[in-house]
């Protein structure tokens, strides 16, 4: 549960103990809430929960794995973001803000760690046909990709190490 920071810390320790570190970290967890700001005045907890999962959980894993990556002078952190970050999708302010925070962190960190052999890639993932988008009927008319195509984008990121895939 990456929304639970203690759980993140336990995962990092387990990976270090059992595998000696992490070569590739793919942050793919996501919580999406479709609700306009005008309908969110009394729902601040939605923003907190979304940031906790989409940003702070991923950040906790990154901060946990980075020291060993630096020590080994290699590592690649791939953050699954959203095409919504590029389009500022209405009614998704909590989700887009959380993904934008991770995108901005990654862009800053990438320049700090490139000379240490650490790469960061942000994938601004299009809509993927998963249960997460199923309840939103308007997506039925939007172009989507399959989970297999999404996995191909992650494999391309691992192979080519670009800063961004749109």
Residue positions per predicted region:
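Rossmann-fold cofactor-recognition segment
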Residues: 1-5
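Conserved amphipathic alpha-helix within the SDR
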Residues: 6-20
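Conserved mid-core segment of classical short-chain dehydrogenase/reductases
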Residues: 9, 32-48, 91
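Active-site helix of classical SDR
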Residues: 62, 98
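Residue(s) in the substrate-gating loop at a strand-loop-helix junction
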Residues: 82
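Active-site-adjacent segment of SDR/Rossmann-fold oxidoreductases
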Residues: 87, 108-119
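C-terminal helical subdomain
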Residues: 122, 139-166
